[in-house]
């Protein structure tokens, strides 16, 4: 009996499982672990997915945001589709957007109120101001140039030359200032600016003397002596120079100083023309040996001035002989020849000074 009961239970269980399998297969066919449904249900699910995709496309379509336009910008340029404005309304002076009269700014790429625009301008006032500031930067080249000249000219050249430079730069009142500064109103000034190069005890040196113009014949002031690379005291040099300078020297009233030597003094004749005023005023002084025999000669003496008789005096009052005088004149003539205009040759030692 129990076996029969157990078999009956097994049959009922198998029948229940078969009924569940049949109910599960009623919706579709089962092959292995996959269940395939009918075409009607499958087509319904596919159409619902396509419907959702189409609605998403419709919502992403770019259109012009101007009221009354709503133009489709799908096939337009990316600029217009990105900013949602058509080509016509992007250049219009007045459109209605969100119920307000506005205008499209081509630099901001946005719509602004009409009060933010200037007349006949396609960009807003704020963008135009920034654009003008970038374009119209102040050029500081002229100001830097003028400040540099104003800073360096007085320190390097002095008052007269700085006035000349200012006259060149365009200052109309600078030329009168330069002319007034060039005039010397003080007493007679005869400053021999002596420059000794490689000077030492017992060695040869080259000294150049550049006397200045004399405006009055009141006195002398030789306080402008400059010595380079020398170990001697400038005050001692000044005293020696004053002792060696003779008193009976011809001083012309035209403003030219005579050529003064250590032992020999040659009175320089007055110049022929005013054009050679500064050229005749320069002299060259050569010192050779330990005895420091100074020889003065002018680098710009012409043949007519050399042929004129020159008065040679010695500090003790005696006069040089004719032979020595002719010898000095020959040296001057050789110096003024074309082949010897660029150098000077002395007999004891050879000096080649390029002028």
Curated annotation (Swiss-Prot):
It is found in: Nucleus. Residues 12-27 have a biased composition (Low complexity). Induction: Induced in the shoot apical meristem (SAM) during vernalization. A motif (Bipartite nuclear localization signal) lies at residues 121-137. GO terms for biological process: anther development; positive regulation of vernalization response; regulation of cell population proliferation; regulation of cell size. Residues 1-27 are annotated as: Disordered. PANTHER family: SQUAMOSA PROMOTER-BINDING-LIKE PROTEIN 15, SQUAMOSA PROMOTER-BINDING-LIKE PROTEIN 4. This is Squamosa promoter-binding protein-like 15. It comes from Arabis alpina (Alpine rock-cress).
């Amino acid at each position: 009996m129990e076996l029969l009961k157990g078999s009956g239970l097994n049959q009922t269980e198998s029948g229940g499982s078969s009924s569940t399998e049949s109910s599960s297969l009623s919706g579709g066919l089962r092959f292995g672990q996959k269940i395939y449904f009918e075409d009607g249900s499958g087509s319904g699910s596919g159409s619902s997915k396509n419907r959702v995709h189409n609605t998403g496309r419709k919502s992403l379509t770019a259109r012009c945001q101007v009221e009354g336009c709503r133009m489709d910008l799908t096939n337009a340029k990316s600029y217009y589709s990105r900013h949602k404005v058509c080509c016509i309304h992007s250049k219009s002076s007045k459109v209605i957007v969100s119920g307000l009269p506005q205008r499209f700014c081509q630099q901001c790429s946005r719509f602004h109120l009409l009060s933010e625009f200037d007349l006949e301008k396609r960009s807003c006032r704020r963008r135009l101001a920034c654009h003008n500031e970038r374009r119209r930067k102040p050029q500081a080249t002229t100001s830097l140039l003028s400040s540099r000249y104003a800073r360096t000219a007085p320190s390097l050249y002095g008052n007269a030359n700085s006035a000349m430079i200012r006259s060149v730069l365009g200052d109309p009142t600078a030329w009168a200032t330069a002319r007034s500064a060039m005039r010397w109103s003080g007493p007679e000034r005869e400053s021999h600016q002596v420059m000794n190069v490689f000077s030492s005890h017992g060695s040869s040196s080259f000294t150049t003397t550049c006397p200045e113009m004399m405006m009055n014949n009141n006195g002398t002031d030789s306080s402008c002596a400059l010595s380079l690379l020398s170990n001697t005291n400038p005050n001692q040099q000044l005293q020696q120079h004053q002792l060696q300078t003779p008193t009976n020297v011809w001083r012309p009233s035209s403003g030219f100083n005579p050529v003064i030597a250590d032992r020999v003094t040659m009175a320089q004749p007055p110049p022929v023309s005013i054009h050679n005023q500064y050229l005749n005023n320069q002299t060259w002084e050569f010192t050779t040996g330990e005895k420091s025999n100074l020889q003065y000669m002018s680098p710009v003496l012409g043949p007519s001035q050399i042929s004129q008789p020159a008065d040679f005096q010695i500090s003790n009052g005696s006069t040089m002989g004719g032979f020595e005088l002719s010898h000095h004149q020959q040296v001057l003539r050789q110096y003024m020849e074309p082949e010897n205009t660029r150098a000077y040759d002395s007999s004891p030692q050879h000096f080649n000074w390029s002028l």
